[in-house]
């Protein structure tokens, strides 16, 4: 790796649920970001190598960070990427209509991408295989206190078995995979980031995560109805519930 020893770390970014570490850095007077993760996650959708390759495939299809460099060193994967400009989607939380319009715009852009030759699958069978790997290696999120209040399960293996036995029929498109707060809004469009789980998947995966966000920020059900009116879809609550449950141990 050419640049990993040249970057100057400016600070660590706020912690999320991901096991990856993210740092704001400077490289040759340019702000960039360094993302690092232990290589035990290399076979999962936490992999920053996977994220880098997905970003490069998307580079002429959507607005995404530029990949400056990625690779493996001392049992960790590294990704150095460019900084994104614009307002984070969370800046619009106090403006529900604008916030929901941004979500819908982002979904439409993702779902319009031709998925032929997409390098990665995030379909249910892939995610369940990944979840089994995480459970077997004791790196899944099995702390039920982190789960949604609406989750009916209180045992990780019972939930995993239910997910295996109740897989819905998939309507495939390009999915962000961790949709909701992972994009910026600028004068020239939407910029996507945190793309490690991006790939071919059911369109309802991203929709489910948007619904989860809307419910958290806007308890008034009229906003959820507005979201589906904007999408031009009737809600499939069976699928929405499935994908929210699938996300519990990630």
UniProtKB/Swiss-Prot annotation:
Source organism of the structure: Campylobacter jejuni
Lineage of source species: Bacteria, Pseudomonadati, Campylobacterota, Epsilonproteobacteria, Campylobacterales
Gene Ontology MF terms in the entry: ATP binding; kanamycin kinase activity
Pfam families: APH (PF01636)
Alphabetically ordered keywords of this record: Antibiotic resistance, ATP-binding, Kinase, Nucleotide-binding, Plasmid, Transferase
E.C. number(s) listed in UniProt: 2.7.1.95
Reaction(s) catalysed by this chain's protein: kanamycin A + ATP = kanamycin 3'-phosphate + ADP + H(+)
InterPro entries: Aminoglycoside_PTrfase, Kan/Strep_kinase, Kinase-like_dom_sf
Record's keyword annotation contains Disulfide bond: no
Active site: 178 (proton acceptor)
Protein name: Aminoglycoside 3'-phosphotransferase
Similarity comment text for this entry: Belongs to the aminoglycoside phosphotransferase family.
Biological process according to GO: response to antibiotic
Stated role: Resistance to kanamycin and structurally-related aminoglycosides, including amikacin.
């Amino acid at each position: 790796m050419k640049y990993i020893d040249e970057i100057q770390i400016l600070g660590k970014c706020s912690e999320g649920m991901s096991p990856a570490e993210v740092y704001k850095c400077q490289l040759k007077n340019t702000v960039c970001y360094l993302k690092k993760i232990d290589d035990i996650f290399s076979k999962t959708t936490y992999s920053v190598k996977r994220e880098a390759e997905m970003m490069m495939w998307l580079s002429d299809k959507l607005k995404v960070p530029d990949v400056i460099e990625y690779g493996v060193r001392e049992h960790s994967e590294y990704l150095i990427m460019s900084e994104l400009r614009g307002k984070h989607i969370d800046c619009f939380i106090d403006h529900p209509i604008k916030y929901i319009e941004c979500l819908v715009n982002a979904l439409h852009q993702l779902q319009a991408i031709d998925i032929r030759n997409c390098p990665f699958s995030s379909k249910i069978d892939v995610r369940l295989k990944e979840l089994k790997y995480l459970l077997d290696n004791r790196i899944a999120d099995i702390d039920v206190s982190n789960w949604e209040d609406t989750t009916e399960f209180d045992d990780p293996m019972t939930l995993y078995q239910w997910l295996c036995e109740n897989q819905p029929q998939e309507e495939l498109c390009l999915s962000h995979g961790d949709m909701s707060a992972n994009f910026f809004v600028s004068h020239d469009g939407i910029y996507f980031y945190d793309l490690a789980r991006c790939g071919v998947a059911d369109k309802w995966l991203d929709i489910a995560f948007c619904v989860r966000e809307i419910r958290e920020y806007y308890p008034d059900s009229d906003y959820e109805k507005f979201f589906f009116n904007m999408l031009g879809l009737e809600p499939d609550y069976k699928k929405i519930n499935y994908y929210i449950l699938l996300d519990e141990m990630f």
